[in-house]
A protein has these predicted regions:
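A short secondary-structure junction motif
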Residues: 38, 42, 152-156, 203, ...
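C-terminal all-alpha effector/ligand-binding and dimerization domain
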Residues: 160-209
């Protein structure tokens, strides 16, 4: 499972052409992680139709782990199932990622209002802060929703955005969020949350990460 492959276009797929190599992946990377990254990076384009057999053949694995991966990807909002039991990559329309991150911002703001000593997370990594927030949520539906946003979209963005200046700015906004939450200055906290998530939205909408 070193390589994942792609089609340049749906026309190529219909002509029976094999997917193109996307690049070598670590063997320990799961199928769902490989496919998720390829979709978010736009290596597998929006509206591309996929089958279990095609993916399994190209990744040189059995269909069972592919089937399980596709179930997860559907739950994560990256693919949709078709009547013929194939799947299709969702169409990331303008504002798609903004809506996801705005929901994350809303939920994190509500949870931070309920947390004790949020400033104690200051020494944690950026991703660890987000994980700590959803783990401290007492509403199971909110927690699972925010977990999905964190582990799919935030994790991917934090891992792949290479601009060090932007990374530093984003982390500074997050630290200010925790400081204002600690002081119970919730209006200021939400202002910093807005700035933080706006940075992430901007990067995703460029679709260059």
């Amino acid at each position: 499972m070193d390589t994942i492959l792609k089609w340049k276009s749906d026309t190529d797929r219909k002509k029976g052409k094999r997917m193109e190599p996307l690049g070598v992946k670590k063997k320990q990377g799961s199928i769902v992680e490989i496919l998720r990254d390829a979709i978010l990076h736009n290596d597998i384009e929006c509206d591309t139709e996929l089958t279990q057999k095609e993916i399994a053949d190209n990744l040189e694995v059995s269909r069972m782990p592919v089937r399980e991966a596709l179930i997860l990807l559907e739950y994560q909002g990256l693919i949709r199932r078709l009547p013929n039991n194939h799947v299709k990559v969702v169409n990331f329309t303008k504002g798609y990622f903004a809506e996801i991150f705005q929901l994350g911002m809303l939920l994190e703001g509500k949870i931070l209002r309920q947390m004790e000593k949020p400033e104690t997370m200051m020494q944690q990594s950026e991703l660890s802060v987000h994980r700590e927030i959803y783990r401290n949520c007492h509403n199971q539906l909110w927690s699972k929703t925010l977990e999905s946003i964190t582990e799919i979209y935030l994790e991917y963005g934090i891992r792949n955005i290479q601009n060090q200046e932007e990374n530093k700015e984003r982390e500074e906004f997050l630290h200010k969020v925790l400081k204002e939450a600690e002081k119970k200055e919730y209006a200021k906290m939400e202002e910093q949350l807005q700035k933080y998530f706006s940075c992430m939205i901007h990067e995703f909408e460029k679709r260059e990460i």
